[in-house]
């Protein structure tokens, strides 16, 4: 199953390795990653968008585990609004 996450993280060199390492340990394949440093009032932070392919079994609790990382300030799972067309 494909899952999408948006994270507000500390803009530090080890942040990407910690987040992707957690995904690897949970057997989630990172299929897309976007990292953008914050501008203006949120200096020192970055927005990290993740698209993961993970089994339901291994994905259980992934949102909570991502949020428990020290470098992660906020995490949200994004729901897909795309509808499949059968035909």
Regions found by a protein language model. Give the residues of each.
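A conserved regulatory-domain signal marking ACT and ACT-like small-molecule sensing domains
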Residues: 1-87
């Amino acid at each position: 199953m494909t899952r999408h996450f948006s994270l507000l993280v500390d803009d530090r060199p080890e942040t990407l390795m910690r987040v992707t390492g957690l995904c690897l340990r949970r057997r989630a394949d990172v299929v897309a990653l976007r990292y953008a440093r914050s501008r203006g009032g949120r200096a020192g932070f970055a927005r990290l968008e993740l698209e993961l392919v993970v089994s339901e079994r291994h994905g259980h609790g992934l949102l909570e585990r991502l949020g428990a990382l020290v470098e992660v300030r906020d995490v949200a799972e994004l729901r897909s609004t795309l509808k499949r067309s059968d035909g």
